[in-house]
């Protein structure tokens, strides 16, 4: 799933897609993501399922709110329409701002079903 997320989003930000966090000197905009949970599939036959689920938080980071929000919508569209997995937003994105950097961001959780 990790490679599939990268492959789905890399074209939006010139390959600047990172699990967990980006290097400090990464040019903006960029995307980070991390798994924050998911559903477990249990079978009565005690077998390993061929699918897995992850709730993935996707973060967009940009220099301005005016550039972060449209990119967040592009991320949502790219994940929803990916042929590599099935992704469904859990809710709309939430805006954020880190005054220490400073950087504008969004975060949105997606339930992603993929091959195991």
Regions found by a protein language model. Give the residues of each.
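Small/polar-rich, solvent-exposed N-terminal microdomains that initiate assembly or binding
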Residues: 1-46, 66, 70-77, 82, ...
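Short C-terminal domain-edge/linker segments immediately following a structured domain
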Residues: 49, 61-67, 87-92
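Oligomerization/assembly interface segments of phage tail-like spikes and tubes
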Residues: 50-63, 104-115
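Low-complexity, flexible helical/coil segments
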Residues: 52-56, 66-73, 93-98
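Acidic-leaning, charged glycine-interspersed low-complexity segments
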Residues: 77-116
């Amino acid at each position: 799933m990790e490679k599939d997320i990268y492959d789905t989003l890399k074209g939006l930000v010139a390959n600047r897609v990172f699990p967990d966090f980006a290097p400090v000197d990464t040019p903006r905009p960029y995307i980070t993501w991390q798994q924050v949970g998911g559903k477990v599939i249990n079978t009565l036959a005690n077998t390993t399922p061929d699918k897995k689920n992850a709730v993935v938080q996707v973060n967009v980071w940009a220099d301005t709110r005016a550039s972060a929000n449209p990119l967040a919508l592009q991320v949502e569209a790219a994940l929803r329409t990916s042929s590599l997995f099935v992704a469904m937003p859990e809710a709309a994105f939430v805006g954020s701002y880190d005054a220490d950097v400073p950087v504008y961001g969004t975060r949105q959780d997606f339930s992603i079903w993929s091959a195991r």
